[in-house]
A protein has these predicted regions:
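Short polar catalytic/cofactor-binding loops
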Residues: 12-17
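Glycine-rich phosphate- or other oxyanion-binding loops that anchor nucleotides, phosphorylated ligands
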Residues: 19-188
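Extreme N-terminal starter segment of soluble prokaryotic enzymes
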Residues: 2-9, 31
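A short acidic-Thr-Gly-centered motif at the start of a beta-strand
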Residues: 1-2, 130
Length: 188
């Protein structure tokens, strides 16, 4: 009998975001958690390394912190749309967020399990920013979403709003979202 759910994997950038908690699904099976490190490249590498290790994998869940100017600190959000906010080839005639010569859509769309979060856009980039143009911003979700989109894996992303672009707020709130996330995961 499998003591963990082989069809679901949680990816989080840092152990501090999860407090090293063990997450259980609705059948009380452990959902494995892997840590990607910060940023798009680290997230991509970790996702690609994890994929062959879990042959029954159907869903990747990303949990982490995010900044927002319009969603209050302390709220857990299910993101549904992902854009690469720092891809800027506009001088070459490309739209902001669109990778030149890449057939992947500019905005990757997935379903959310949280009601009323169907149009939340997460802007992912390798920089901390205070001028937030999207519903929220992070540093990993788009990278993980793109790997999932390419390989046909379901992708769910939950972001805990830790700050409004202020690094000091982030440091204070980095671990505060784990209990809200744990409640959601226990229903999957």
């Amino acid at each position: 009998m499998t003591l963990y759910n082989p069809e679901i994997l949680i990816l989080s950038a840092l152990e501090e975001e999860t407090n090293n908690e063990i997450f259980l699904d609705k059948n009380s099976k452990t959902i494995k958690t892997l840590y990607t490190g910060v940023g798009k490249i680290n997230a991509t590498i970790a996702t690609l390394k994890a994929y062959p290790l879990f042959p029954e994998l159907k869903t990747i869940i990303n949990f982490g912190t995010a900044g927002s100017n319009n969603i209050p600190i302390g709220k857990l959000i299910g993101c549904t749309k992902f854009v690469q906010r720092d891809m800027d080839a506009r001088p070459l005639g490309w739209e902001l967020g669109k990778t030149p010569y890449d057939k992947t859509p500019k905005i990757l769309s997935f379903k959310s399990n949280i009601p009323n979060d169907e149009n939340i856009v997460c802007g992912t980039g390798d920089s901390f920013c205070s001028n937030i143009e999207y519903d929220l911003v992070d540093m990993e979700a788009y990278a993980i979403a793109k790997v999932c989109w390419i390989y046909g894996i379901n992708f769910i992303s939950y972001k805990y709003i830790s700050d409004g672009g202020d690094a000091n707020e982030w440091k204070i709130n980095i671990s505060n979202g784990v209990n809200k996330f744990k409640k959601i995961i226990s229903q999957i």
